[in-house]
Amino acid sequence: YDSRTKEFLTKLPAAPTYFHKPITALNSHNGDVVRPKRCKWLNYEGEIVIIIGKTCKDVSIEEAGEYIAGYSVGNDFGLHDFRDTDAGSMLRVKGADSLAPVGPGIVTDWDFRNKMIRTYVNGELKQEDNTDNMEWNMHYLVADIARTITLVPGDMIFSGTPAHSRP
């Protein structure tokens, strides 16, 4: 999101960055997020999750929507204590057990354009933005990843977060 780029006072990189979340990070909508011992900085990031519906490899941005089964909401929690330790890989930061709650459902035939995304923490609004302010839209993300990685049904892509995610 443009708001996140501005928040960190950085220039937009030439391409999005991605990281892997192991299946053990996946959690249900009302599942318990487990803060590991010695974790001081547990960060929230409300995101729209793209769910792949059929095998996808080397597709164009224009074709990408044909491979999306639907969308859900997710919280991309992160253990920011490990941010420097992992030197950019984000595996421990984002991949720890239970840190990726998704759901409660999937919407299909949904146009992601011009939609509001909001993150609440204990009932208080913390993040708010419009999907039209994404630096790279949902179809771009699918096509970009599928240039080098085969996506299969059930794969999920967390699409990025607006400004104001904090531990």
Placement of each model-derived feature along the sequence:
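A generic local secondary-structure boundary/capping motif
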Residues: K6-L9, V33-L42, C56-E63, M90-K94, ...
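A short secondary-structure junction signal
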Residues: E7, H29-D32, K37, V59-A64, ...
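Hydrophobic, aromatic-enriched interface-forming segments
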Residues: G46-V49, K57-D58, H80
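Extended, compositionally biased flexible segments
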Residues: Y1-Y44
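Residues embedded in well-ordered beta-strands
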Residues: E47-I51, S72, R118
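Catalytic-pocket segment enriched in acidic/His residues
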Residues: R4, H80-P167
